[in-house]
C-alpha cells in the first residue's frame, strides 16, 4: 500500500509545525522519520494515521484520498513507544483484541482468531508467554506484543512512534534486527519515528530527515551519510568536526595555515569546514595528503579501528575527532599528521561548491 503525502501543512494556533510537506512512499517500503524534538516528525506520523488532522493538504493511500477518514477507517496499525497494552488481559488476549472488536461481518470466528494469534505469537517468538500478563513481561517482550497486536488485523500500513525509545540499548539493537527481518518477510509498508540516527539507518529503506517542520533530505541511509543535502543533515547525522576559516582569493585559510583550492570561488570570506572523523586523512608521517601536525589526547579502541581525539599543534585551537584503522593503535601523547582534503565548506547554510566536490588542499604554504 503506497502513501502519498501532498502539501501537508499543520498549525497549532499561531505555531506552524509542518510547512508544506510532500513525500511519496512506495508500497512495501520502510521509511524512518528522523529528527530532533520539535521537528514535526510525530505530528506527521499522527496525520498519516488519522489521529491528527492537517490544516491543509492531502493524504492518499494507494491513490485514494483518506484525508477525511477517521483513524479507525484507514486500516492502519499503530505501535506506541509505551506499548499501551491492556494490563488485565493476557498476552494472547491483547493480541486478539483487535480481531474481537471488528464489526460482526468482518470478525473471524473463534477458531480463526486462535489460529491467527498462535501464528503471530510464533512470529514474535512469544508463544511460551501466551498466558502471561503485561506486568510479567520485559520491555522488549511488551513491545513485541504491541507489534503483534497491530499486525493481527492485517493493516495496510504499519506506523510506529519511537517504538524502541523506552528500551535499553542492547534490547533496542535486538528488536531493530528483528523488526527488519519481519518487514522483509511480510513486506508491509511502514513508517516509524525516531531521533536515533543509528536506528533509522539500520532499519529503514529510506531516511527522511526533518527539522523545524521541513524535510531536509529523503534518501537511502548510506546516501544521507555520504552526501548530506544540507548543513543541518551534515551536523545532525553523527559526529562531525567543524573548523572555522576564511577563503581569500584561491586559498583556504585555517589558523596559521593556508592551502590553494585550485581555483578562485565566487564567494570570499569566512567559512565553516566540516569533516566526519573517518574523512580526516591521518598518518604517522607528514605527506602531501596529511601535512598538519597533531598530538593524541585520547585513544579509544573500537575493534577494527581506533577513535582518536587529537589536538592540532600550532595551526588550530580546537581538538578534532578522527579515526585510524589498523592494529597498531597510537598512544596518548604521540605525534601524528592529518589532512583535510575531503572537507565540505559552508557559508552559513549555503554549501560552497569546490572543484571535483572536494578541497584540493595541498601542502601548507
Swiss-Prot record:
What's its membrane topology? Peripheral membrane protein
Recorded superkingdom: Bacteria
Gene3D superfamilies under this entry?
Answer: P-loop containing nucleotide triphosphate hydrolases (3.40.50.300)
Pfam family of the protein (one): ABC_tran
Role this protein plays: Part of the ABC transporter complex CysAWTP involved in sulfate/thiosulfate import. Responsible for energy coupling to the transport system.
Spell out the note in the miscellaneous section: CysPTWAM system can also transport molybdate.
Query: How does the record describe its quaternary structure?
Result: The complex is composed of two ATP-binding proteins (CysA), two transmembrane proteins (CysT and CysW) and a solute-binding protein (CysP).
| Protein name from the UniProt record | Sulfate/thiosulfate import ATP-binding protein CysA
UniProt lineage: Bacteria, Pseudomonadati, Pseudomonadota, Gammaproteobacteria, Enterobacterales
